[in-house]
Amino acid sequence: MELADIRREYTKGGLRRKDLKADPIDQFNLWLEQAIKAGLTDPTAMTVATVDENGMPFQRIVLLKNVDKDGFVFYTNLGSRKAQHLEHNSNISLHFPWHPLERQVHITGVAEKLTAMENMKYFTSRPKDSQLAAIASKQSSRISARGVLEGKFLELKQKFAKGEIPMPTFWGGFRVKPQSIEFWQGGEHRLHDRFLFSQHDGEWDIDRLAP
């Protein structure tokens, strides 16, 4: 089969302005709740796009860990490629692809580092093995073999068999403060529904976009 022949119709219904909440964070939370209830695999998984100092874009899948009126939160190794990019350019884009619901959400904004207290609160809530993995992996660095990583993990597991695991200084989170949030709902005959929330002077404007 030719790739150009792979297609389907979008039949799960449209999206109208009257259906939208006035605040896009409330609308996002509604859609996220529906994605979770629908049993989607990894409903909190999002594509995170950053740009390096040469203007080259990079993307990767990261899990959303919190969302509130202040923005969208994720955690990472602060020496990772994404974190280094954000040091040079704090502009960022998030994308949630909820394919089974024929929905997408696209967010643009600016990333800010979380406080040490916020980082510690989440780190201590993680499973112990996840805490150890955060210490063992120098994210995005080159390693000779997987065995090196596994050996470091086992070494740390023995070292911290008892007691609390200290949060590494090279680990932390970012809060993405949104500047725009677009909601996309698939429609029949490729007449999809798109609504863009844009923030101006602390208020959200809503525009319908052509598909």
Curated annotation (Swiss-Prot):
Subunit structure, as described in the record: Homodimer.
Species of the source: Vibrio parahaemolyticus serotype O3:K6 (strain RIMD 2210633)
Essential cofactor(s): FMN
Protein name, as recorded: Pyridoxine/pyridoxamine 5'-phosphate oxidase
Reactions listed under catalytic activity: pyridoxamine 5'-phosphate + O2 + H2O = pyridoxal 5'-phosphate + H2O2 + NH4(+); pyridoxine 5'-phosphate + O2 = pyridoxal 5'-phosphate + H2O2
Molecular function (Gene Ontology), one example: FMN binding
Protein residues bound to FMN: 60-65, 75-76, 81-82, 104, 139-140, 184, 194
Chain's role: Catalyzes the oxidation of either pyridoxine 5'-phosphate (PNP) or pyridoxamine 5'-phosphate (PMP) into pyridoxal 5'-phosphate (PLP).
Listed EC numbers: 1.4.3.5
UniProt keyword annotations, A-Z: Flavoprotein, FMN, Oxidoreductase, Pyridoxine biosynthesis
Residues given in the record as substrate binding sites: R7, R8, E9, Y10, K65, Y122, R126, S130, R190, L191, H192
Annotated TM spans: none
HAMAP family named among the record's database cross-references: PdxH (MF_01629)
Pathways per UniProt: Cofactor metabolism; pyridoxal 5'-phosphate salvage; pyridoxal 5'-phosphate from pyridoxamine 5'-phosphate: step 1/1; Cofactor metabolism; pyridoxal 5'-phosphate salvage; pyridoxal 5'-phosphate from pyridoxine 5'-phosphate: step 1/1
Signal peptide as annotated in the record: none
InterPro entries the record matches: Pyridox_Oxase (IPR000659), Pyridox_Oxase_CS (IPR019740), Pyridox_Oxase_N (IPR011576), Pyridoxamine_oxidase_dimer_C (IPR019576), Split_barrel_FMN-bd (IPR012349)
GO biological process: pyridoxine biosynthetic process
